[in-house]
């Protein structure tokens, strides 16, 4: 059994901040941001728009696309590093809003690799016949975890959610490789805010996303192509057999570098970070939804999905659409 993609959806806040808005907050410019990241704008959630709001919004659209009722879903898995609450989990909040009373629900924290890890997890459950219909969501409200005085990070991130409905069916194919490098975890961190015990705690700065940009960039441009090559080699699939490579939308330069290292044309690497920025766990599923809605995906297409991020973690999966 394999989880077949039968519906996708995405949701982003209406409020948009472009690069010129950020130039009023920190020393930067539209040109500087575009040249280094490819980002032009990002969606920023309002106070009453939390991770559950976005996750449920994307999930509803995915269910509509799949022509499936919420009661038919028996697994809801949410990848996020920005939950509204530690408990209950975001997935339970989504269950409540959808009325998916038959679903088992839990969250997964895999940072920017989160949606890939969530897909792997859901596929494993479906393959074993434990569940029949899975709703996988990546949702982030990164604006609340971003230091808006730090030019090195605030230009990157945005808010949003993506979702996919997987139905267990005979046939199809799914394969994946994932790796973790815990010893390099310090390159990209977000300290728990539960550790702040008193006012004016000197650790307060650490409660925002902290990143060694050069180290993360070097990691991504080398390890992502490495994972893709490992996956295709193991599955005895050539690059020519791949219709599209959907990579985590962190930085345009990373994706262009991956295309070069794989010897593939950049046209096979769709990008949308110009409109969303880096949405961490949400980015792959937002991109997948846009590809489906635009009519670019055809049944039988072979897709490579690749993620990389905090941990450090990285990996790739091969799925037949």
Outline where the language-model segments fall:
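Claisen-condensing/thiolase-fold acyl-transfer catalytic domains that form or cleave C-C bonds
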Residues: 52, 56-59, 63, 82-83, ...
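Short acidic, glycine/serine/threonine-rich loops at helix termini
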Residues: 16-17, 87-89, 146-150, 314-318
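Short glycine-rich phosphate-binding loop at a beta-alpha junction
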Residues: 71-79, 239-248
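Condensing-enzyme catalytic core mediating Claisen C-C bond formation in acyl metabolism
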Residues: 1-47, 150-218, 222, 226, ...
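Flexible, glycine-rich active-site loops centered on histidine and acidic residues
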Residues: 127-161
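Short beta-strand segments
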Residues: 79, 109, 134-140, 166-167, ...
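Conserved beta-strand elements of the Class I
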Residues: 4, 74-77, 135, 243, ...
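Acidic-glycine-rich active-site phosphate/pyrophosphate-binding loop
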Residues: 26-35, 85-99, 135-142, 195-202, ...
């Amino acid at each position: 059994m394999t989880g077949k993609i039968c519906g996708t959806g995405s949701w982003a806040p209406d409020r948009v901040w472009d690069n010129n808005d950020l130039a009023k907050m920190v020393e930067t410019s539209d040109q500087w941001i575009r040249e280094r990241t490819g980002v032009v704008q990002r969606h920023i959630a309002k106070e009453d728009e939390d991770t559950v709001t976005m996750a449920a919004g994307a999930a509803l659209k995915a269910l509509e696309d799949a022509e499936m009722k919420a009661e038919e879903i028996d697994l809801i898995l949410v990848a996020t590093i920005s939950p509204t609450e530690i408990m209950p989990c975001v997935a339970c909040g989504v269950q409540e809003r959808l009325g998916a009373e038959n679903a088992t629900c839990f969250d997964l924290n895999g940072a920017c690799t989160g949606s890939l890890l969530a897909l792997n997890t859901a596929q494993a459950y479906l393959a074993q016949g434990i569940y029949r219909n899975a709703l996988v969501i990546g949702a982030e409200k990164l604006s609340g975890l971003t230091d808006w005085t730090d030019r090195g990070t605030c230009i990157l991130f945005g808010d949003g959610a993506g979702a996919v409905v997987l139905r267990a069916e005979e046939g199809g194919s799914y394969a994946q490789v994932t790796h973790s490098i815990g010893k390099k975890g310090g390159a990209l961190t977000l300290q728990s805010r539960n550790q702040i015990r008193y006012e004016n705690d000197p650790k307060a700065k650490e409660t925002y996303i902290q990143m060694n940009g050069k180290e993360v960039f070097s990691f991504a441009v080398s390890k992502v192509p490495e994972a893709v090559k490992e996956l295709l080699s193991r599955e005895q699939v050539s690059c020519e057999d791949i219709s599209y490579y959907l990579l985590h939308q962190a930085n345009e330069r990373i994706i262009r570098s991956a295309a070069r290292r794989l010897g593939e044309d950049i046209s096979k690497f769709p990008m949308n970070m110009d409109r969303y920025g880096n949405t961490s766990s949400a980015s792959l599923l937002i991109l997948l939804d846009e590809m489906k809605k635009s009519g670019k995906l055809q049944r039988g297409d072979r897709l490579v999905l690749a993620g990389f991020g905090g941990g450090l973690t990285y990996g790739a999966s091969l799925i037949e659409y």
